[in-house]
């Protein structure tokens, strides 16, 4: 189950499509893709 926007994460693979894990805050942020 993937994490949605601003969901807690430890790596980008934790996040849903088009999201990446912020290394600074450890939550999922938009990666700029559609």
UniProtKB/Swiss-Prot annotation:
InterPro entries: Huwentoxin-1. Expressed by the venom gland. GO terms for cellular component: extracellular region. Keywords: Disulfide bond, Ion channel impairing toxin, Knottin, Neurotoxin, Secreted, Toxin, Voltage-gated sodium channel impairing toxin. It holds the Pfam family Toxin_12. SUPFAM superfamilies: omega toxin-like (SSF57059). It comes from the Eukaryota. GO terms for molecular function: ion channel inhibitor activity; sodium channel regulator activity; toxin activity. Disulfide bonds join 2-16, 9-21, 15-28. It is found in: Secreted. Ion channel impairing toxin that inhibits several voltage-gated sodium channels. It acts by inhibiting the inward component of the sodium current and by shifting the voltage dependence of channel activation to more depolarized potentials. Its most potent activity is on Nav1.7/SCN9A (IC(50)=167 nM), followed by Nav1.6/SCN8A (IC(50)=696 nM), and Nav1.2/SCN2A (IC(50)=3.54 uM). Belongs to the neurotoxin 10 (Hwtx-1) family. 54 (ProTx-1) subfamily. The presence of a 'disulfide through disulfide knot' structurally defines this protein as a knottin. Negative results: the recombinant toxin does not show or very weak activity on Nav1.5/SCN5A (IC(50)>10 uM). This is Beta/mu-theraphotoxin-Pe1b. The lineage of its organism: Eukaryota, Metazoa, Ecdysozoa, Arthropoda, Chelicerata.
């Amino acid at each position: 189950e993937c994490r949605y926007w601003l969901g807690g994460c430890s790596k980008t693979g934790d996040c849903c499509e088009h999201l990446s894990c912020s290394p600074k805050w450890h939550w999922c942020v938009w990666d700029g893709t559609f």
